């Protein structure tokens, strides 16, 4: 479920964009249509909200319909070419280029009521790296402000003979992430990173996401299947030309067919970690 970004390039291929769109729709459905789990009063006229790793700003655009037009919405991402054009943004939305590993503008420090981020921390190379990235995000909140983070865990899936394609997909994905210094399991590490960063009043939810035939309904079955297939296609591009250790083109072709069939007939599951808390006042 994590962000799949090739460390050699910050641009995104169309299948990766499709994956992010599907991911947003699926997670919104899993959350019962909610965009935030933190107990934030979205009716406040002076709200300042940051969405880090905003991509196409899907989350912010949905949020814009729920908050007053006087609220200030900011989105950041390493790939600004994916931002919606100004004509498709509300006047109270600002989008700008920013990596979570680069220093943040001093004017942004301590200025947000809510900092939100989904599926970005896989890019951290170690627990220390993750804790530091979370601490930098927390520093953007006002004293008493909220931080809400969402991450996945690619390591924990259903295994066994009936899940051979999903297991092979998992193994290829984990190897690809590790090869570019990313961690495949930021979800289980999330609360430790947040606690070490100084987050207080923390709450964590771990949800099981049914994939394909194991999904709660047909729409989520279709979204989750396409999400997995788009991840596989992104990993295929990441590993192209990377030597004998990378799967062959034929293996990717065969695996995509097998993975689709297995998900549609048997299904699988992922664990989804959501945690929120506050900056100490």
Swiss-Prot record:
Induction: Expression is positively regulated by the thioclapurine cluster-specific transcription factor tcpZ. Pathway: Secondary metabolite biosynthesis. It is an enzyme of class 2 (transferase). It comes from Claviceps purpurea (strain 20.1) (Ergot fungus). N-methyltransferase; part of the gene cluster that mediates the biosynthesis of an unusual class of epipolythiodioxopiperazines (ETPs) lacking the reactive thiol group important for toxicity. Firstly, L-tyrosine is prenylated by tcpD, before undergoing condensation with L-glycine in a reaction catalyzed by the NRPS tcpP leading to the diketopiperazine (DKP) backbone. Afterwards the alpha-carbon of tyrosine is oxidized by the cytochrome P450 tcpC to form a hydroxyl group. This is N-methyltransferase tcpN. Keywords: Methyltransferase, S-adenosyl-L-methionine, Transferase. SUPFAM superfamilies: S-adenosyl-L-methionine-dependent methyltransferases. Pfam families: Methyltransf_23 (PF13489). The keyword S-adenosyl-L-methionine applies.
């Amino acid at each position: 479920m994590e962000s799949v970004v090739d460390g050699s390039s910050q641009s995104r291929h169309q299948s990766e964009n499709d994956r992010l769109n599907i991911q947003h729709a699926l997670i919104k459905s899993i959350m019962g249509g909610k965009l935030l789990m933190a107990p934030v009063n979205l009716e406040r006229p002076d709200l300042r909200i940051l969405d880090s790793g905003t991509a196409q700003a899907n989350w912010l655009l949905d949020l814009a319909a729920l908050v007053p037009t006087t609220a200030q919405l900011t989105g950041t991402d390493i790939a600004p070419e994916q931002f919606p054009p100004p004509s498709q943004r509300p006047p109270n939305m600002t989008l700008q280029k920013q990596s979570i590993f680069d220093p943040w503008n001093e004017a942004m420090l301590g200025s947000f009521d809510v900092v939100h981020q989904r599926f970005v921390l896989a890019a951290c190379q170690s627990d220390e790296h993750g804790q530091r990235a979370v601490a930098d995000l927390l520093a953007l909140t006002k004293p008493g402000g909220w931080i809400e983070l969402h991450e996945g865990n690619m390591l924990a899936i259903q295994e066994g003979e009936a899940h051979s394609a999903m297991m092979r997909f998992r193994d290829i994905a984990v190897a690809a992430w590790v090869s570019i210094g990313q961690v495949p399991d930021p979800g289980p590490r999330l609360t430790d990173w947040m606690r070490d960063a100084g987050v207080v009043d923390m709450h964590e939810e771990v949800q099981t996401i049914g994939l394909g035939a194991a999904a709660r309904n047909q729409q989520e079955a279709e979204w989750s299947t396409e999400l997995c297939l788009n991840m596989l296609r992104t990993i295929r591009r990441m590993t192209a030309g990377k030597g004998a250790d990378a799967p062959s083109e034929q293996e990717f072709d065969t695996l995509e067919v097998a993975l689709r069939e297995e998900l549609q007939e048997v299904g699988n599951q992922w664990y989804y970690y959501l945690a929120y808390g506050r900056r100490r006042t």
